Amino acid sequence: MKKLKVTLLASSVVLAAALLSACGSNQNSSTSTKKLKAGNFDVAYQNPDKAIKGGNLKIAYQSDSPMKAEWLAPLSDDATFGSMSSPGGGQDGLFFTNSSFKYINGGPANVSLYKDAKTATITLRKDLKWSDGSEVTAKDYEFSYDLTANPAYGSDRWTDSLANIVGLSDYHAGKAKTISGITFPDGENGKVIKVQFKEMTPGMNQTGNGYFLETVAPYQYLKDVAPKDLASSPKSTTKPLVTGPFKPENVVAGESIKYVPNPYYWGEKPKLNSITYEIVSTAKSVAALSAHKYDYINDMRASQYKQVKDVKGYKVLGQQELYISLMYYNLGHYDVKKSISVQDRKTPLQDQNVREALGYARNVAAVQAKFSNGLATPANGLIPPIFKEFTSPSVKGYEKQDLDKANKLLDEDGWKLNKSTGYREKDGKELSLVYAARVGDANSETIAQNYIQQWKKIGVKVSLYHGKLMEFNSWVDHMTTPPGSDDWDITDGAWSLSGEPSQQDLFSAAAPYNFGHFNDPEITKDLNDIDSTKAEDSTYRKAAFIKYQEDMNKKAYVVPTAYAINYTPVNKRVVGMTLDYGAMNTWSEIGVSSDKMATK
């Protein structure tokens, strides 16, 4: 199942599969039949019945925010739509991967890496077409770079990693009209692309590495749309071209997508006649499942697990999540002209002791125990445990509450407790911070207020942004619109990660997703070390990952919160369902064994 590099998620307690929607992406191969387990969950559902011909699969994505339809990957950062777009191609991903997230051949395109030449060659399938029957070309692959690197399109996916492509930084800065490092051996209308790098990195053979793009965009279809209008154009929102086994027949803004088979799909023809994919609110999802309205619902919350685990007619599947939730501190702004974070904000949070104290004051373990139903665990570092070769329990984070240590850190930093107010002061100023907490599920308000009370115990006054939780889409706009806002101090984030654990795209000085805009030479060195040629040695790379996590915990620019197991209740009429990371299948092979939902 394919993933984009990083994708924002709505809930910070525990998330379902995000882009790892229960049926993977458009790249389809045979279904895995291995009896895989994640914790106590089966990863796949082995339906004893065969699929009927045709049928309609009914899927929902649980969200309290509207669907933001954007069919161009460089212009989208929303996990909800990333999942909902997957029957049509998951915003048109290109490569197959195995269960270790390494590239394999056989998908819409193959990639070959040449270490000595410092190049990648991407070869598109000869029969790869858009859903209008037009050829997918080399120019369509380059166009994804145009969308990402040309500021006129408004993408927030430009990173230091992409700057490793020869000529792409000059193009991004407006110093060049073309990208010198991307060439077409067979011409723009051919099927071969060569990408020239400045340096090769050890993670380049992993999906989501961030050093080259994994998607295409239909250049001929979109070339006449003005860059400033493209993100909102019907051609990218409601009437797109796609490459997957299904194509959108109808897109209802904010609500739903109806898919029908794509007659120009290169692979196995779908078994289903149609797929409907809808938004369902957290308030209605459990009732909808109990009424057998959907075959499955993506992004069920951990807090709902007890309500859905025994609903008749469903099998609950699970998978270790490529997921990390964390707390951010607002430390600076993003310099758009220079594409770099500047850590210049005047705030008590510039003091490391204050950041650490806020981290140690949180009772994350108690929150997870109360609300996650065993589906989330406190995080000791920024790398999820599914990447067991790159993390270690020896990394010490903020998973255990330590109010004594938090108080000591603030005492050492000169923050004195005013006994009449109960809050700390320094140089005549109260330690008062704004918490931009956001809506995730029914427990979001309770969890936010809980953390505010924990911070009060150490004398830190924290109030919600404008006195309430932020709606998720508003929060995303607030955090991702450069140069950033000065009206918040603390926020939470949750990320659906890629198969390459390097976090250049999250925390490098150039990463727009570095919401707090910290810029630290030591962290930059750590990130670069992870991707250096020395890190081609797996032992060296693991040590580099551990050092990076230890340094991030020490400096506390962000504070890890939780890891998660995703679960998905699947109706027992569904055939060919798996959450296996190595399964590139299912949108063609998934089917139903009956026209009616199973109820027993």
Swiss-Prot record:
InterPro entries: Peptide/Ni-bd, SBP_5, SBP_5_CS, SBP_5_dom
Alphabetized Pfam families for the sequence: SBP_bac_5
Entry membrane topology: Lipid-anchor
Compartments in which it is found: Cell membrane
One function term, GO molecular function aspect: peptide transmembrane transporter activity
Gene Ontology terms: cellular component: ATP-binding cassette (ABC) transporter complex; periplasmic space
Protein name: Oligopeptide-binding protein OppA
Biological source species: Lactococcus lactis subsp. lactis (strain IL1403)
Gene that produces this protein: oppA
